[in-house]
Structures are given as C-alpha cells and as structure tokens.
C-alpha cells in the first residue's frame, strides 16, 4: 500500500520528520549559518507541501475572516463519502442527472423498505414560520455528561444548507464533486433514500464552496435552490423532477458574490425566490405546480436572507431583505407595501427579518451595522414605518436571532447576546460561540457553534447560563441545525449527525 493511503503515517511523517531534519541540520558541524537557514526553509516548505499534497490539508476562513488550516474536505473526503453511500445502498442504477428538457427524468432511489412515517413539522427553513422555534414536543434540558445520545453520524457533501423534514425523510442539498445534489435521508437511520443532481459548482475563497439555500417541503414536493440559481421542484418520495428554472438566467440577474443563499418560500400556491434582477425581477413568484411565472417585483440586488411570510399591521405579507432595504410585499402580486433603507458597509444582509409584535419588525446585519425594530402604521394601501429603536447591540452576520418572552437572543458577531425587544437594551453578552447558529426549544437556546459543538443555554434575560455542551461535528460549521420528531439534525461541509433531543 502506498504511503498516501495511510493518513496516520503521512501525518506522523509530516509532523515528526521536518523537526528531526531541522535538529540534525543545526547539529551538523562545518555548515555555515546561511546554508543552514536555507536548508531549514527548504525542510519547512517540503513538510508543509507534504501536508497539502498527501494529507489533504487546505486553507479556509472562519466567519470572522480568520485563516484556518483544515484536513477535512477535498478528494479524500469525496472518496470516503462515495464509499459510505455505496456500502449502505441496495443495488441500484447510477445517479441520473436530470436534464432541463426532461421533467420526467428519474432520480436514484433505493429498492428498500420505505422509511418510518413522521410528521411534517420542520418542513420549512428554520422551522414553522421561519422563526427558529421548536415547539412540537418538549426537549431534554438535563443532558448526560457526554452529551445527547447519537442516533447516527456519517459523511455528507459540501455546502451550508440546513435540513427540512417530512414523512420520515430529512432533505438537504450538498456539493458532491462538480454536482449539486438534493438528497433525502431516512431521519431515523441516516440512510440515503434518493438523490437528484445537476452540474453546478459554486466556488468562493472566503465563503467556501457549494450550495447555501435549504430545500423546503410542501404538499409532497421539495423545492431546492442551488448556489448558481438552479431551482428544482421534485417529488419528495422519489426525487423525480417535476419542473425547473434557473432563476438568474430567467430574470436577467447576476449571481451574488457569495452565491444564491435565500431558501425558496412556498405560500398560496406560489414559490417566492429572490434572484435580484432589474426591471421588476428582484423578487419573483412562480406557480408551485408548473413553474410558470406569476409575478415579479422590485429592481434591487438580492440579499442572502430568505423571504418570510408574516402578519404585521393586520396584513399578511412577505418580509424581504434586499441588498439596500427591508420591504414588505403583497403576497398576491408582489406590490410594495412599505420600505426602510438598510445599507451595510459590505452591502450584505443575511439575517432573517422577524415579526416581533402585531405591528413591529426586527431587522439586523453584521459588518458593524447593528439592529432595529420598525413599527408599521397603515397608510393608504400600505404602511409607513417608524423606528422604535436602532443600535449596534445585536449584529447578526449570517445567523438569525430568536424571540422569547420579550427578549431577542442571537450571536452578535460570534458572541451570544440578549436584547430587550421593546427598548433595544442589552441585557447580557458573553460566551464565544463563533459564527454558529441557534434555535429556541423549551425555553432554551440550542446553539451549534462554528467549531461544531452543540450547547444548551437557558433563554433568560438575567444572565448567560450555559447548561451543557458536547462536541457534535468536526470542522467549520455554519449550517443551521434542525429539530424534527425529537431528533436534532446537524451538519457541516463534511459530516452530518442526528441526536435524540426529545424529553420522552
């Protein structure tokens, strides 16, 4: 067996041999300091190159733009992923790449028994209402010393999408080599049930590679959006293609620097997406059954936050962040109901807008910008806006806050914070969780840190109270967790896992 096939030997050689060579070099007599210095540089360069070439080490960036060296991902990871899937699948044809002109093209499906039935509670991005709240059943708040019970854990493709779940299946979208792949997994076992793929590879040095938007489930269909704008409607039981559109090409829009990241929103028979095209093509609605265009609105460049449905000021409306403002749009035709300028230093809005009262909306951005609560008052066929408060006490970068009993909890540039939603007053701030994500369940915050730890924090305004913590994933973790049928689902660029979090 070649040395490159023995990772432990390679790592040991890379870590031990260069220092040994340096020691021997500097102990050698009769060699000038200049030659020893050149030799030392050569040894270090060879050692580092060895790690990059043979052990898969690569450079990536944290959410704070800090340089991180990682041994995860790359060719070695793809081989592990493919070997794992092959080992756990019944004999089946190879993945069939569905062509745009062939809406009936089948996806790869297993000839094995169907998964156990389950609910469709967490069928949307961030759960019901896109609020990040799990209320289906109580969660365990007294965790064992070693952490929650692990139900399953396995490799996964790249990207930053979360999970949705319905009828015993968990859905996500991944990068596998040069394909974007929508995958359905048995939520109880982690076994892959079907995949549907197309050619696409979005790459970005700072932000990483792969799809970002989370697929959503509605009435037996999965709606998935790739990082390069490919929108697909699939049968949720089989992965069979129903229809597809590239929302960038269809609306004359250019891709964002960090890729398409906003999850589709299905409402009133329409699929709402944000391609960011001009001439009324910034926010677009397609018919959920046929994929035909229903309406288009605005001329703004897109943001990274996902559209949200909420009732504010007595009117059911779409809350949308664009690159330069927060807006409310009429569901039926996309008509602008209100707007509020919201321009960040980097032109990036990635946190979800939240309806925090009958007539109030919370918005936030990172990059030193901050947060605000807007009050909407009916005026004519729309609303006028008034700022209740605005400050920099909560800067949600590419994670979103949750509201609990009058207080907002969120990551303020990587540090957990609690803010009074009425006044904007900072109640506490502490604990470094990196640019991770969080959910609210049973009066507690379930935080998935940037380093892959799962942390339980009591949602209380008095002080930061960390209850429990355990390591769930290895490597940089920006993906939002999901909770369905008592299981906590987590993933990052290289692995995915399920943990039993239900109290019963």
PLM features: residue spans?
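Blade-level signature of beta-propeller repeat domains, shared across WD40, Kelch, NHL, RCC1
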Residues: 369-371, 452, 476-504
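Aromatic (tryptophan-biased) beta-strands that constitute blades/sheets of beta-rich domains
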Residues: 67-155, 181-183, 188-204, 240-253, ...
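Loop/turn-rich, solvent-exposed surfaces of beta-rich toroidal or solenoidal domains
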Residues: 369-371, 393-459
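Short coil/turn segments that connect the beta-strands within blades of beta-propeller domains
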Residues: 167-168, 219-220, 268-269, 315-316, ...
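Hydrophobic, aromatic-rich membrane-embedded alpha-helical segments
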Residues: 7-26
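Extracytoplasmic beta-rich repeat domains
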Residues: 147, 151-164, 195-216, 244-266, ...
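Internal/C-terminal transmembrane anchor helices
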Residues: 35-58, 72-73
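Short loop/turn segments immediately following the C-termini of beta-strands
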Residues: 67, 74, 127-130, 175-177, ...
